[in-house]
Amino acid sequence: MPIAILSEHNDLADSVRDLVKRVAPSEVLHEALETPIANPPTYWKAAAEQGLQGVHLSESVGGQGFGLLELAIVLAEFGYGAVPGPFVPSTIASALISANDPDDKRLEALASGDAIAAYAIDSGLTATRQGDGLVVRGEVRAVPAAAQASILVLPVAIDSGEEWVVLDADQVELEPVKSVDPLRPLAHVRANAIEVGDDRVLSNLSRTLARAVMSTLLSAECIGVARWATDTAAEYAKIREQFGRPIGQFQAIKHKCAGMIAETERATAAVWDAARAIDEASETSAYEFAAAVAATLAPVAAQHTTQDCIQVHGGIGFTWEHDTNVYYRRAIVLAACFGRAADYPQQVVDVATTTGMRSIDIDLDPDTEKLRDEIRAEVAALKAIPREERNTAIAEGGWVTPHLPKPWGRGATPIEQIIIAQEFASGRVQRPNMGIAAWINPSIVAYGTNDQQQRFLPPTFRGELIWCQLFSEPGAGSDLASLTTKATKVDGGWRITGQKIWTTGAQYSQWGALLARTNPSAPKHNGITYFLLDMASEGVEVKPLRELTGNAMFNTVFIDDVFVPDEYVLGEVDRGWEVSRNTLTNERVSIGSGEPPFLASLDQFVGFLREGQFDQIEQHEAGRLIAEGHAAKVLNLRSTLLTLAGGDPMPAAAISKLLSMKTGQGYAEFGVSSFGTDAAIGDPEQPSGKWADYLLAGRATTIYGGTTEVQLNIIAERLLGLPRDP
């Protein structure tokens, strides 16, 4: 999934992608490995004709008048194409000048493509004040595109602080140096007592904003590289055969490719969030945090995915002639352009524990305010109802699951659902908690008879009926096609015998959704029927399973010749697989949308860090975990916005579920490891015992609702198109 969500952003990405394909095919990239790149490159004019050099610049200087998000979309496509030459450095340099003054006349030549600029994120330049200007001395090492540029935007140290200056290339001494990536030439820049007037000092550009702009836009190119590596590895895995089948059918390759797309999507979400934060001109801490998150994740994603792409290709990936050579080199140089890698996770920790993390909010169109006012009034009316009657009113109004069709829901659009959730939260009106029923109710609505709907849905929505899900079996786990619980037709119903396991909350449930095999001669996914089981029926025995935490959330359920009337068959006989697929889809959306209550949350983790003392290595690890946790939340936001835009939210939702559970485990592992010998204390009243509980409970999160390994298979097959197991 690219950065773009809105249709106009997708159109922009498509147009840039078309240009990149034309001007930077593989043969052009490999030619640039051997021979110097023309200056300006041959594509420069075509890019200027599309307005790409000035997409982010003000119309007052000939730009397109858009923002950093649009430029990030452009740079991601240039990264995907590993486009040679100075385009990315030049647009980042112009973004710095624009951040200081969007009407700066120097931007006119940059917007039109008549000039090329370069920048550095760090430098060894120092300045002393002389009248109204500065005198600059020193050296900046390994500046990308410096030898191709006519304008240089560089930081200088002065008075224990930092200023940014704009120098002409003919004022400095340039020493070209060999670049790891020949497509991105480097040069050392030396300044020998250069006098710089105050009109060349970017006095409105703070160090915080400058670094946020640079790191966000560099990160955008990184995710383009990562996406190319992921796509290329997956495509090769589909066609390369070993041992008589495509290598993409082997689970080891599937999991590697799924890990690549997961890491890429996480970094993409972070870049999108950072670019939006800067464009919103929100509080400094918000964009500082978001940009540091992007810089923590994106260059690592580019390096990991290009390395894995080489690995998937095997020997051919380790040749000079293969494109993997080009992209791995680009990833290495991009990572270097960020400066010290450890600075960014440290910055994440510093901002998170002082001014706070960037909030995750959904901004809706102002046209929705009338709808919001109406919903707010209805929520206020519900709040005025006596508490003992309120749940009935909420249920009858369709507020519990508003996306369901009337009368069970409100037939709410995605936008309405968001507003309803926001207004119930802000109005402090609590809706009945559906628990497992949140996954079962949609199946009853979709497949149930009128009698079944009337019998079960109203009391469930009122919170009076508790449900469990009787799917998994010993030996089969979540492999529903292999279930062996048997249902035999008898007069007026069915006799069911079997055993279910890992049934959450069965000891508290009045009803269960049960799958049983009704036709053993049918293919594995056929011959299964979906039953609604009264848990008080004779022959049903529930035995709690004590988990490694000492608690008993799961259960084994023994079903011994239990009679289930025909009226409790949901959907058609032998077609229960279809009904269960509806339930499982609801399960995945639900689990992927939040943090489990028994797992340490991101906010709890940051609070823990705020109260403790940690060394640099620990802070670096903590910053990485915070960045990953924040990006997982942004993935959820993107999933919601994709739904609003009519797109497919599945990739972001599936990957968010996969990543958020692993990150939650990471919080607990970090917390426990920080206690030293006290980590052995299991008293939940003590901080170490509390985090030990999180650590123990967290092992379940990568198992229930689909194990990590199964999720990786699903991601590889559904998102990357790798072949299914035979």
Task: State where each predicted segment sits.
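Amphipathic, small/basic residue-rich leader segments at the start of a protein or domain
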Residues: 1-87, 343-435, 445, 455, ...
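Glycine-rich beta->alpha junctions and the first turn(s) of the following alpha-helix
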Residues: 2-14, 52, 79-80, 172-265, ...
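Extended, hydrophobic interaction surfaces within ordered domains
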Residues: 223, 230, 243-356, 690, ...
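A short, Trp-centered hydrophobic/proline-enriched beta-strand micro-motif
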Residues: 113-123, 463-471, 515
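C-terminal helix-coil-helix/basic helical segment that borders enzyme active sites and/or dimer interfaces
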Residues: 25-35, 238, 242-245, 261-297, ...
